[in-house]
Amino acid sequence: MSWYEKYNIVLNPPKRCSSTCSDNLTTILSEDGTNIIRAILYSQPKKLKILQDFLTTSRNKMFLYKILDDEIRRVLT
């Protein structure tokens, strides 16, 4: 028996954002990105920790959403 056989991981499938949702999010972030992003990240400490761990583990330095880069980098470092 391998050590990893005792683990059971269940992941929910990701939810897609409609084009309207995506447009609204982009508009909101471009208008007041810094304050909104900070509020979202700090209001969800568990998700912030998961994101931080993921970025540390994967050493992912590139995001598709360029508007998020500065704030996420500031919060996570």
Curated annotation (Swiss-Prot):
Disulfide bonds: none
Highest taxon listed in the record's lineage: Viruses
Alphabetized Pfam families for the sequence: Pox_A3L
Sorted UniProt keywords: Disulfide bond
Induction per the UniProt record: Expressed in the late phase of the viral replicative cycle.
InterPro entries per the UniProt record, alphabetical: Poxvirus_A2.5L
Primary role: Late protein which probably participates in disulfide bond formation by functioning as a thiol-disulfide transfer protein between membrane-associated OPG072 and OPG08. The complete pathway for formation of disulfide bonds in intracellular virion membrane proteins sequentially involves oxidation of OPG072, OPG128 and OPG08.
Subunit structure: Interacts with sulfhydryl oxidase OPG072; this interaction involves formation of a transient disulfide-bonded intermediate, allowing disulfide bond transfer. Interacts with OPG088; this interaction involves formation of a transient disulfide-bonded intermediate, allowing disulfide bond transfer.
Protein family per UniProt: Belongs to the orthopoxvirus OPG128 family.
Protein name stated in the entry: Protein OPG128
Organism: Monkeypox virus
Gene: OPG128
